[in-house]
Amino acid sequence: MAHNGWRKPTPELSVAEQYAQAGERLSIPRNRAMLAIKKVATDIGLKPADRMLLDAFSGFTKEQDWEQGRRPIVWASNEYLMEHTGFSLATLRRHARHLVNVGLIAFKDSSNGKRWGHRDDQGYIVDAYGYDLAPLAARADEFEALYVRIQEERRMCQGLKKKITIVRRIIRAKLDAAAEKSLTGPWTKLTESFELLLQRLPKRNESVEKLLDTLDWFASFKEQVEHAFDRAFSKPQNDNQKADQQVLDSVSNSHNTTPSGVSDETHI
């Protein structure tokens, strides 16, 4: 990246320029580039103000600016950008710098630091200095692939949460049945352990790995509860054996609970 001396070179500026050069070699429609970044904006840490500024930048460009061999340069004045975003000058500069630092836009600086540009009769940019949106074109494939991965992980997380919910309800049903029928066994300790395990339930936006660990914890604990439950019913029964067996059958039916059976309730 060529620096004219008035802007201090940084690694982030260099990376942004590399993305801009890569974007110039591609032909990515403006709508595709903008849709790609919008779909993952929150996931990569962009704030609403960042997205608003990107929209203002994009609105200044034309479709032909995104063709191969060209760069979508934005030379809009600060006044124009402030009017379209509602930002103060300081806020505008701060978010523009952030977009550069994360490699979404680049600076194309004139020798005096002023933004300006010129189009020919066909509307193509002949010469321009300002904010360069070519990095968005360069990273469109990256962001589209990221969105696919994010959606797949979300589907996996939803499935794991349903499984955790089912296992949790099986455990609760057995503990409640044991308490109701005063079954012999370490039920007080198991109930206390279950309450502690519930405190380890993941919050929102947990990773697949965290949910897998949680499912393993609950599945292992379910085996302990089922073992205690089976031991209680393997001992000689009194005159209430038939009633106790009905309780066992009722709780065992909870194993047949399916995700569709609880889909209307909050999982985990």
Range-by-range predicted roles:
Residues 100-212:
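Winged-helix/helix-turn-helix nucleic-acid-interaction surface
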Residues 156, 172-268:
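Electrostatic interaction modules used in gene-expression and signaling proteins
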Residues 1-73, 125, 184, 188, ...:
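Short recognition helix of helix-turn-helix/winged-helix DNA-binding domains
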Residues 51-55, 79, 97:
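N-terminal, well-ordered alpha-helical segments
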Residues 68-86, 99:
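A short alpha-helical element within helix-turn-helix/winged-helix DNA-binding domains
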Residues 81, 92-105:
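Basic amphipathic alpha-helical segments that dock to polyanions
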